[in-house]
Structure formats: structure tokens, C-alpha cells
């Protein structure tokens, strides 16, 4: 039997060589491989193939290995590739990406992907599946952020804070062992993975180690607490001892030292640099040069990406609010103006496109928007395609660019903070934190968000309707968000020292606990598809940015995709 590509795509979703548009962007991904055996596709429904004795094995039990969940015929967009496959989930983890079904009557079925009577089905035909996002720059200012992040497709939040305290509104620190304990307790209620950063600003290691032993997954150095060379050195030494990450927001006004002094204090040790673009803070005007170094893992945040005609005006007022500044004080106004530089903000987009900035993150409620990491990442990708054209290695599709950009908010932040053994990609063995998208809504509004293999958020219609689809349809909480289900579908990340110190037992934590690990030997070469290290220079007078001698300049845009048309109602 033969059918046209169009007919096949309508029935079973795209196959090898077919292209899918991402939302209303100009980005098109092409399926590189299809794991399906043509004619043996797994489809659920009346008269379809997942029935007893057909695609569903009638003998296998859950104990024998039958899947708990199969997502059928999905296009998977991951840093590892763009493929069409079934995804098998067992005990909340991905056990296979390939061909599911009944090996009694089918060839090529993955032995770990057998469908049985105990298997639930999510139809992925015509859908895109991505890994849940990992946001590494969270100010934990209000718990409602969790709902917004999860609804956007982000399933892991890392950062610091204790609520709308003045310190937390400005810095991503959960300061001290007592607050660390209380935030770990609060995290029990959230159907999302979390990890908390302690305050790293101390010239002695003792108060830093105390926070790590209380469960902090890392330490945050912030200029508002004094990112001095002595504090940096002590923090780096504590991190080396505990195998944790350090995130740094450097000294904007160069009060305790210049960029070179910070580099000397860091040495050759790995560190995650927030706000590599400088608008969110950091050595003015040349913080961007840090993206040249092998031990620097750079990220930037949603406020400045992509560069638009409104970016500059928006930032000055945001700066005043977020960093407890006063518009009546000339020095505070000068402080704000020193950060907001059009030339460096423009260069940020290009550095993302060449893979020199490795990660994107939100800076939630502290200049950034927690629900827009994914949207803005893809807006940058679209802007760069329109302004810079295809990337090397692309032939009629945008696969190289798509894989580079999705890595920025999935695998790379997971690697940076020692979580990649659990989350960050659609790979065997990882927690089934998966996001299903209708291609027309890609990047904006997920259809389903799975946590640990269970649906936590979904586009759902009127609960009193006779079917699930009548209006109003919007993102609603699902069963993984209720009761004790979230304890078995979400992870609280913790330092190895905190786990060894018995923190989960002392606090009576019921959520899954996982240690961060394998951090201190990382380098930028570990940043998937985003490991470029050009020689970056910034003109101190004009703020022009150069990479390997080439000026990085682009124009602001007045229109972005994935924007207003999706939020009319």
C-alpha cells in the first residue's frame, strides 16, 4: 500500500524529510530519522492498532516490564537530534525513545517499550515533544511563579530567595541555614523540580559551608552583597570542596575591582556567570568578555532578548525597582545608565546565535519574566535567522539553529548545575519531564506538561462540558499537581553534603531527593552546541562589541513572533 506524504502526515504525523514550522516564526525543523516501521505505527482509538492482541501485548504485566505510558509518533526536538519516535515511560522515567508495540507480532520493537494492559497512551501524532525547561535564574519572590513557569513548559527552577523580602527581590540567594530549611519545606507543595542557592558573599568559608550542609545546591555571589575578590575566592574554595556550582553577578561599578580582578579571583575554576550581557548587572562595560573563557559558563536573561525597539526604555525603570534604587539620587540614576548599553544588548543576540552565550534564563520578577524563557529564546532564534541567515551545516531547514537554541534552556543549564543525570533532555534514564506542543503554538502555549511521567498542566476546556474541548480552554492544573503525587513526580535537588548531613530526614521531606554532582571539572566545552569561545573585546567609549575582530551589531526589531497574536484571549 502506498500513500502520499500529506496523507501519511495527517494520519501518523511527519516522517523523515518532512518539515514542521515552529509557531509563527520563520524557523522550520526537518525530521532527521523516523524510528517507526511503516505499516506498524502505534495509534490509539477506535479501529486503531493499540488493541489487545494487536499493538497491545495481552500477556505482559507491569512487573514484567510493560510501559506505564507511551507517547506515540511524536516529533522530538532535542539537542541530540530531531527525530520521529515513540517515547516509553516507566516508573516516571524515560525508558526508551524508539519503536513501541507488541513484539509477539511485530519486528523492531524496543524490548523496554512493550505496550501492555497497564499502559496509558498520549497521542503524539502531529505534536512536538521537548524536554522540560531548566531555569537557573529564579528569584523565589512569590510561589505563584511555579504555576506560571510550569504552564510555559519549564519544569525545573534553580535560584534563591525567601519571598518578597528586599534581599530576595534583588538577589537570587536563600540566605542562611534556617531559611534554606524553610524553603526546602515549602518546596514540598510544588509540582516542579527545585534547587536553592545560598548566599556566597563572605570572606570566610565557614558561613558558606554551613549553607551547603543545609542543602544548598550552589552559592550565589551578588554585587548587592559585595562581589569582592576576597568573597569570590572564599566562595570558589567552598565550591571546590563541596562539588557545587557558583553563580556570580559581578561588580557593575567596578568598586572592588575590575573585570581582570574578578578573573584573577576566579582563577581557572568553573563558574556560572549571570547577566553576561551586562544590562542585568556586572562589570561595566566589558562583562561580556567573560564569554571568551573556557572556565566561564555564560547565561543571559529574558529582559534583553531579543533586542527590540522597546528594550532600552523598559530597562531603566525596571532597574530602579529591582535594585532598591532611588530616581531622585543622581548616583543611583548613573548606576542604572551604566548598565543599559544598546551596543552590548545588540551583541547579545549574535553571541547567542554563534553559540558563545550558552544558556538563557528568566531573572524572575527581578527584571525578567518567569513565563517567557522559552518564548524569548525562540524569538532570538527567529530574529537571528532573519538578520543573519542560515547557519553553517543547514540545508533547507533550521535544524542546527533549533538544536542550538533548545540546548540553551534544557541540557546546558542542567549540565552547569549538576542535574543532567536527571533532567535536561529526552534521553533514556531521565525523569520524564516532557512538554507536548501543537506546532502552531510551539514556544508559547504547551498542550501538555508532564512531570515525572504524569500530566501536571494541560490546556483544558470547561470542566462541566460533555467533552474536554469546549471554551474556555486555558492551562489548568492536573493530577500530578495534587496530593502526594507531586512528591513522586518532582525532585528537590540538594548538595551531596546536605544529603550526607541528613537534611531530608531532619526536615521530613517526602519529595524525591537527588544530589547535584560532577560540577567542578566542567568547562565551556561541556556546553552542548554552545561552546564557542571567540576573542571578545568591548570598546570602553562606544561600547561596540567585537568577536575575533568582527563587530557584532544588529538592529532592534519592532515586531516579534510568538507575541501579541497569541495572547488576545
From Swiss-Prot:
InterPro entries: Amidohydro-rel, Metal-dep_hydrolase_composite, Metal_Hydrolase, Urease_alpha_N_dom, Urease_alpha_subunit, Urease_AS, Urease_asu, Urease_asu_c. The keyword Cytoplasm applies. Ni(2+) 1 binds at residues 137, 139, 220, 363. GO terms for biological process: urea catabolic process. It is found in: Cytoplasm. Binds 2 nickel ions per subunit. Its EC number is 3.5.1.5. Substrate binds at residue 222. SUPFAM superfamilies: Composite domain of metallo-dependent hydrolases, Metallo-dependent hydrolases. PANTHER family: UREASE (PTHR43440:SF1). Belongs to the metallo-dependent hydrolases superfamily. Urease alpha subunit family. Heterotrimer of UreA (gamma), UreB (beta) and UreC (alpha) subunits. Three heterotrimers associate to form the active enzyme. This is Urease subunit alpha. It comes from Bacillus velezensis (strain DSM 23117 / BGSC 10A6 / LMG 26770 / FZB42) (Bacillus amyloliquefaciens subsp. plantarum). The lineage of its organism: Bacteria, Bacillati, Bacillota, Bacilli, Bacillales. The gene is ureC.
Amino acid at each position: 500500500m502506498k500513500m502520499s506524504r500529506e496523507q501519511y502526515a495527517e494520519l501518523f504525523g511527519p516522517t523523515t524529510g518532512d518539515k514542521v514550522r515552529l509557531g509563527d516564526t520563520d524557523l522550520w525543523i526537518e525530521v532527521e530519522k523516523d524510528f517507526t516501521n511503516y505499516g506498524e505505527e502505534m495509534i490509539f482509538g477506535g479501529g486503531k492498532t493499540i488493541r489487545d492482541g494487536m499493538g497491545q501485548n495481552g500477556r505482559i504485566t507491569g512487573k514484567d516490564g510493560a510501559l506505564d505510558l507511551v507517547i506515540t509518533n511524536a516529533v522530538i526536538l532535542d539537542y541530540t537530534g530531531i527525530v520521529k519516535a515513540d517515547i516509553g515511560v516507566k516508573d516516571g522515567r524515560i525508558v526508551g525513545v524508539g519503536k513501541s508495540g507488541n513484539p509477539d507480532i511485530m519486528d523492531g520493537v524496543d524490548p523496554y517499550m512493550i505496550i501492555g494492559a497497564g499502559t496509558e497512551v498520549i497521542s503524539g501524532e502531529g505534536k512536538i515533544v521537548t524536554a522540560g525547561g531548566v531555569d537557573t535564574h529564579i528569584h523565589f519572590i512569590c510561589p505563584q511563579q511555579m504555576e506560571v513557569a510550569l504552564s510555559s513548559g519549564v519544569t525545573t527552577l534553580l535560584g534563591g530567595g525567601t519571598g518578597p523580602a528586599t534581599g530576595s527581590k534583588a538577589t537570587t540567594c536563600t540566605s542562611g541555614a534556617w531559611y534554606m530549611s524553610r524553603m526546602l519545606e515549602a518546596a514540598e507543595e510544588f509540582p516542579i523540580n527545585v534547587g536553592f542557592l545560598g548566599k556566597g558573599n563572605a570572606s570566610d568559608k565557614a558561613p558558606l559551608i554551613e549553607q551547603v550542609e543545609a542543602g544548598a545546591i550552589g552559592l550565589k555571589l551578588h554585587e548587592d552583597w559585595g562581589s569582592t575578590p576576597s568573597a569570590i575566592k572564599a566562595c570558589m574554595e567552598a565550591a571546590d570542596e563541596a562539588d557545587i556550582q557558583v553563580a556570580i553577578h559581578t561588580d557593575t561599578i567596578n568598586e572592588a575591582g575590575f573585570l581582570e580582578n574578578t578573573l584573577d579571583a576566579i582563577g581557572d575554576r568553573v563558574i556560572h556567570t549571570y547577566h553576561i550581557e551586562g544590562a542585568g548587572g556586572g562589570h561595566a562595560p566589558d562583562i561580556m568578555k567573560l564569554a571568551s573563557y573556557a572556565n566561564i559558563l555564560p547565561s543571559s536573561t529574558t529582559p534583553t532578548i531579543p533586542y527590540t525597539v522597546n528594550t532600552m526604555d523598559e530597562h531603566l525603570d525596571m532597574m530602579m525597582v529591582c535594585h532598591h534604587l532611588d530616581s531622585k539620587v543622581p548616583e543611583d540614576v548613573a548606576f542604572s545608565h551604566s548598565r543599559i548599553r544598546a551596543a552590548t544588548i545588540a551583541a547579545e543576540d549574535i553571541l547567542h546565535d554563534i553559540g558563545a552565550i550558552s544558556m538563557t534564563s528568566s531573572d524572575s520578577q527581578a527584571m525578567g519574566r518567569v513565563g517567557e524563557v522559552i518564548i524569548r529564546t525562540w524569538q532570538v532564534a527567529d530574529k537571528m535567522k532573519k538578520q543573519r541567515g542560515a547557519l553553517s551545516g543547514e540545508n533547507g531547514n533550521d535544524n542546527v539553529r533549533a538544536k542550538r537554541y533548545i540546548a540553551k534552556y534544557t541540557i546546558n543549564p542542567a549540565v552547569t548545575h549538576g542535574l543532567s543525570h536527571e533532567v535536561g533532555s529526552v534521553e533514556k534514564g531521565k525523569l520524564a519531564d516532557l512538554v507536548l506542543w501543537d506546532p502552531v503554538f510551539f514556544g508559547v502555549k504547551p498542550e501538555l506538561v508532564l512531570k515525572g511521567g504524569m500530566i501536571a498542566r494541560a490546556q483544558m476546556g470547561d470542566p462541566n462540558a460533555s467533552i474536554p474541548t469546549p471554551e474556555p480552554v486555558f492551562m489548568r492544573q492536573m493530577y500530578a499537581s495534587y496530593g502526594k503525587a507531586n512528591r513522586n513526580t518532582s525532585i528537590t535537588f540538594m548538595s551531596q553534603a546536605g544529603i550526607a548531613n541528613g537534611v531530608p530526614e531532619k526536615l521530613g521531606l517526602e519529595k524525591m531527593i537527588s544530589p547535584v554532582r560532577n560540577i567542578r571539572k566542567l568547562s565551556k566545552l561541556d556546553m552542548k552546541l554552545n561552546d564557542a569561545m571567540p576573542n571578545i573585546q568591548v570598546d570602553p567609549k562606544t561600547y561596540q562589541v567585537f568577536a575575533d575582530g568582527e563587530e557584532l551589531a544588529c538592529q532592534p526589531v519592532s515586531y516579534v513572533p510568538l507575541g501579541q497574536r497569541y495572547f488576545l484571549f
